[in-house]
């Protein structure tokens, strides 16, 4: 059935709100963003927002459930670095660039805080009604899965490394680093971010070169 002009316009407006929400989520986290901010970013009035969504919580549900939010933040940046350097990145270079990107978010966009999702989950009321924030954190894990797969495709890490398990480890380490910085009142450092993103390898002191760990998977956890 052919859509009329009203339906087409309504769908376009809806998509504009969703796109604006994705960008605000990445740039500023979600808690400090108001309905006015979302409407302004989408190019519409606050009234237009309420035509499509009941509340900000309702909007978050649509944002997470109706749109795949894999923005490929990390691997997109690594691809860009490879194009600019006109050569393949080494494991050390890839880890440094990934840490550079995430640390810049941490420093320049404090409200975004990589783990703001996890830190705010216990108090944010939407969690009591749905699992939207859990999904938000899962999407962050998926970003790191893509990062690990990117490294594996280039044979920079051992093929037997489990992307899903290791991505959770990375997120857990980054969570701890940022939460610890709040508890101790000391800013996280670039070095700590680099360490979190370099759990795949250590240095072979005898030959002074990166030595890839045999594995980082659940299957070998108790061996």
From Swiss-Prot:
InterPro entries: Homeodomain-like_sf (IPR009057), HTH-type_Tx_Regulator (IPR050624), HTH_TetR (IPR001647), Tet_transcr_reg_TetR-rel_C_sf (IPR036271). It comes from Bacillus subtilis (strain 168). It comes from the Bacteria. The keyword Transcription applies. This is Uncharacterized HTH-type transcriptional regulator YwcC. GO terms for molecular function: DNA binding; DNA-binding transcription factor activity. Residues 34-53 bind DNA. One of its GO terms (cellular component) is protein-DNA complex. Gene3D superfamilies: Tetracycline Repressor, domain 2. It holds the Pfam family TetR_N. PANTHER family: ACREF/ENVCD OPERON REPRESSOR-RELATED (PTHR43479), ACREF_ENVCD OPERON REPRESSOR-RELATED (PTHR43479:SF11). Keywords: DNA-binding, Repressor, Transcription, Transcription regulation. The keyword Cell membrane does not apply. Residues 11-71 form the HTH tetR-type domain.
